[in-house]
């Protein structure tokens, strides 16, 4: 944040939900910088673009490796940006830099070595005929609301553009700022109000009528030469040797002769946690000034965050609902810092949590005062203090105690991970329902943004890995963004879980409109390989007269009719 602008580095799933909860002003976001084009970095971009458009921002510029624009091409039928111009700066271009009234930024592309080269596909095949379906025409009542798209075929070679694999480091230097004129010092030195103040403020020494010389340095605070901060990511070991030997980054290290002005105050690391512990990476970090603050934001290789998802609201409402039924609304097993735990703010290597703040100008350094802290008793007391709540709660408990179960079946079990909220907010996520058909056999109905995170938040990492490894199918009724934009993150999270649990689970059965192919294949060829993680069954194949049910599925699934959109395929699910 600055007084003039806000700059966003990476934009993972759940970004707009956190922005809404913590009152982050998206109206000031016009520049977004990406350290690597992985889903963990770009998964929140489609959703946050819609939010930025809604608050009236006319333009945003994406800085990163080539191919970022493909994300919006692939999503153009369900991410409708009529009033937002999205620009892309190829940060791998050696002539590219960024500069505005606040700072100058240099881009440092870092390529993997040959061992990190992505495998070539067997053939050069078209991704898919571009999807020109207007998914919003029925509800908006006007097909012209969505610009017509020219039907094309998007061709991709088996190899990605080599530059699209680049990781980006950003060296950011704030512009110098003159010291502030201190009025009390002017009075102390006998400077009368008037034009002489302006001369001193401009850095000019003056002579008073009595012949006394007053130096500008006597009455101004010191000039700020412009602090440096660096944002980096080393995605995996195939980048490591090139990363630690990158000359422009080494020039910033104290051990290599960097001056006080060039030494970064802060180094922000999006590097995976395990890789930051590699001896080469640790040695590289040790080259910076001893006072540099290393802010660690990376995930583990299993997709885990260092600590917490940063939302107090989900814990607050879960503690309050827990009062109604402790089994249906169990306490969440996540480990945000609980009230009373000590802060750890002295280490130069800091495991960052949401709202960790470092002030560069004026240089106040680290501030942890805004970091979310769980206060369970406060949330309970908040509910109990409501007029009439205790009496209503007691009546509910008595009613439940006398209730007769309508079934003794243990399954199916449903967990509502999201509801019909088309835009995520602090207490509601977008559409997703997890169904446990029998013990440790799951399917998912819809997969809105942040669904993977909701599963981890509800079950905790260990149990979530088991659940995801035993997830056999996902059903997506239609291609509104709030019903499927979390699918890529879920596919990757499931694969991490399979590897973690050493499961022999095969590809996920994906039941969805066939048009989803354009989105998924474009992502597969332009960003990361994901096609091996799923098998697509088109919803059209479930209609009566074709394939009434999927006999190989964990449940009997058939289609029904719907009026939500012309392309919606509702589902009738019958447990075996």
List the predicted regions and their residue ranges.
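Metal-dependent phosphodiesterase/nuclease catalytic metal-binding core
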Residues: 1, 96-415, 422, 432-437, ...
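Pre-active-site segment of Zn-dependent metallo-hydrolases
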Residues: 1-58, 68-83, 186-192, 196-197, ...
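Structured loop/turn residues at beta-strand edges in well-structured enzyme cores
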Residues: 24-27, 262, 466-469, 506, ...
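Residue-level recognition of the N-termini of beta-strands and the immediately preceding loop/turn
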Residues: 29-30, 58-61, 86, 265, ...
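Short internal beta-strands
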Residues: 59-67, 268-271, 292-300, 504-515
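A glycine-rich helix N-cap at a beta->alpha junction
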Residues: 80-94, 528-542
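Eukaryotic, compositionally biased intrinsically disordered regions
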Residues: 450, 455, 516-517, 535-546
């Amino acid at each position: 944040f600055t007084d003039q602008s806000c700059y966003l580095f990476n934009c993972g799933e759940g970004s707009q939900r956190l922005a809404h909860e913590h009152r982050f002003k998206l109206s000031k976001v016009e520049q977004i910088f990406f350290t690597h084009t992985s889903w963990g970095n770009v998964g929140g971009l489609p959703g946050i673009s819609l939010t930025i458009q809604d608050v009236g921002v006319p333009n945003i510029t994406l800085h990163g490796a080539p191919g970022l624009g493909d994300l919006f091409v692939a999503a153009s039928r369900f991410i409708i940006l009529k009033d937002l111009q999205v620009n892309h700066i190829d940060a791998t271009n050696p002539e590219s830099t960024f500069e505005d009234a606040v700072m100058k930024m240099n881009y440092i592309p870092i390529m993997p070595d040959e061992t990190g080269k992505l495998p070539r596909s067997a053939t050069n095949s078209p991704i898919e005929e571009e999807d020109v379906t207007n998914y919003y025409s029925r509800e908006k009542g006007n097909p012209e609301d969505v610009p017509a798209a020219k039907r094309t075929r998007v061709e991709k070679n088996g190899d990605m553009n080599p530059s699209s694999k680049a990781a980006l480091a950003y060296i950011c230097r704030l512009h110098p700022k003159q010291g502030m004129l201190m009025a009390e010092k002017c009075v102390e030195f006998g400077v009368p109000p008037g034009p002489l103040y302006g001369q001193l403020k401009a850095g000019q020494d003056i002579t008073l009528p009595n012949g006394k010389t007053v130096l500008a340095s006597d009455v101004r605070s010191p000039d700020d030469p412009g602090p440096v901060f660096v944002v980096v990511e080393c995605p995996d070991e195939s980048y490591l040797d090139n990363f630690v030997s990158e000359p422009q980054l080494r020039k910033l290290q104290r051990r290599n002769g960097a001056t006080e002005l060039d030494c970064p105050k802060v180094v922000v690391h999006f590097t995976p946690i395990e890789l930051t512990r590699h001896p080469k990476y640790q040695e590289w970090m040790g080259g910076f000034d001893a006072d540099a603050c290393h802010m660690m934001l990376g995930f583990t290789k299993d997709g885990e965050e260092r600590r917490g998802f940063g939302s107090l609201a989900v814990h607050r409402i879960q503690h309050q609902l827990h009062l109604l039924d402790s089994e249906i609304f169990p306490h969440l097993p996540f480990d945000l810092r609980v009230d009373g735990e000590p802060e750890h703010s002295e280490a130069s290597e800091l495991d960052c949590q949401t709202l960790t703040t470092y002030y560069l100008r004026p240089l106040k350094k680290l501030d942890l005062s805004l970091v979310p802290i769980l206060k369970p008793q406060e949330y309970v007391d908040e509910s109990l203090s409501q007029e009439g709540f205790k009496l209503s709660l007691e009546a509910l408990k008595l009613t439940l105690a006398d209730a007769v179960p309508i079934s003794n079946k243990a399954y199916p079990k449903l967990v509502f991970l999201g509801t019909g909220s088309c835009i995520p907010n602090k207490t509601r996520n977008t559409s997703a329902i997890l169904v446990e058909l029998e013990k440790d056999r799951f399917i998912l109905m819809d997969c809105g943004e942040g669904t993977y995170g909701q599963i981890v938040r509800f079950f905790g990492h260990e149990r979530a890995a088991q659940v995801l490894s035993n997830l056999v199918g996902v059903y997506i009724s239609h291609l509104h963004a709030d019903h499927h934009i979390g699918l890529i993150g879920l596919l990757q999270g499931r694969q991490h879980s399979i590897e973690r649990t050493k499961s022999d689970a095969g590809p996920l059965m994906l039941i969805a409109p066939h048009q989803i192919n354009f989105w998924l294949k474009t992502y597969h060829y332009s960003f990361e390989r994901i096609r091996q993680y799923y098998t697509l069954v088109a919803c059209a194949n479930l209609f009566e007269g074709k394939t009434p049910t999927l006999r190989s599925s964990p449940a009997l699934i058939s289609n029904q009719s719907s009026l939500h959109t012309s392309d919606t395929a509702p589902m009738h699910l019958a447990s075996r």
